[in-house]
Amino acid sequence: MNALYKKNFLKLSDFTSLDIRNIINIACILKYQKKNKNEFPYLKNKNIVLIFEKQSTRTRCAFEIASFDQGAQVTYLGPGSTHLGYKESIQDTARVLSSIYDGIQYRGHNHETIKNLAKYSNVPVWNGLTEKFHPTQILADLLTIYETLPEKSFCNIKCAYVGDARNNISNTLLEASSLLGLNLCLVAPKCFWPNYDFFLKCQLKAKKNHGNIICTEDIQKGVRGADFIYTDVWVSMGEPKKTWHNRIKLLKKYQVNLKMLLLTQNKKIKVLHCLPSFHDKNTIVGEEIINKHNLDNGIEITNQVFNSQSDVIFRQSENRLHTIKALLLSTLLKEFPYI
């Protein structure tokens, strides 16, 4: 029997290092098959429900197309369209949905919600994003890193994450490092460093897998020798604008710009961004923040750097489709097919 059959994916560490490597390998094959239009619909007659308490572009599209490509049917439940936790308990919702569907994707505000969904569900539950973790994003990032540097093992690759190192992306990168030995440097002001106990736990596991994790405020030290610089937005919709002001003031010097790329001393440096990005004034929010805070050419990343690295950044986004597809096959099929 497939070892991941019916297994929940709430955080990256729910899977083993071998599981993650297998998913990346399966994603590579599925990506090749899609490009060559010779996929087989292994998920025919499967039904999947997507619960989105938070809006989404990439995650929703990736889950829907991954399902459709593999022959599964999808129900989308958007913000405000369920009674989850309001008129109907999470426990009852999980029991109802798992009696109808073969799998449940959840994207929302509270990680405790998805933990409770998984606790009372009889089918696999996948995390499309919570405030603590974003494992489906990091699966795509790991595939992108592997494709970009196929000659290197993860323990010989350095990734510098720059910005707010307390968020769901940095938390999940910490787990990736702990499992795969990816060398990770979190470059941020101390007030934006991750929970110490969680950091220490991941650091110890990373060392066992021949990797290293450090935190530093020193940009030059943090990015020197990096193969990848990873950043994310500094502000999220729904947060008070006062929070935006304080955070931008503290993170301003951590903007990913040409000077930072030069500090890596790596002419082949690549930049990762999970998107969306405030690299220009072409969004209402981006224009408001840039004008109000007198920012030069973007917020967390400059327009120049974003566009020069867009091939990798948008490949990250595309790879969500292939890794999510590999995740669905790995957790929904009792016997894994030869593909």
From Swiss-Prot:
Keyword Transmembrane set for record: no
EC number, as in UniProt: 2.1.3.3
GO cellular component: cytoplasm
Record bears the keyword rRNA-binding: no
This protein's UniProt keywords: Amino-acid biosynthesis, Arginine biosynthesis, Cytoplasm, Transferase
Subcellular location: Cytoplasm
SS bond partners: none
Residues that hold L-ornithine according to the record: N168, D232, S236, M237
GO biological process terms, semicolon-separated: arginine biosynthetic process via ornithine; citrulline biosynthetic process; L-arginine biosynthetic process
Recorded catalytic activity of this chain's protein: carbamoyl phosphate + L-ornithine = L-citrulline + phosphate + H(+)
Pathway the protein takes part in: Amino-acid biosynthesis; L-arginine biosynthesis; L-arginine from L-ornithine and carbamoyl phosphate: step 1/3
Binding site for carbamoyl phosphate: S56, T57, R58, T59, R107, H134, P135, T136, Q137, C274, L275, R320
Recorded GO MF terms: amino acid binding; ornithine carbamoyltransferase activity
Family listed: Belongs to the aspartate/ornithine carbamoyltransferase superfamily. OTCase family.
General function of this protein: Reversibly catalyzes the transfer of the carbamoyl group from carbamoyl phosphate (CP) to the N(epsilon) atom of ornithine (ORN) to produce L-citrulline.
Protein name per its UniProtKB record: Ornithine carbamoyltransferase
Species assigned in the record: Buchnera aphidicola subsp. Baizongia pistaciae (strain Bp)
Species classification: Bacteria, Pseudomonadati, Pseudomonadota, Gammaproteobacteria, Enterobacterales
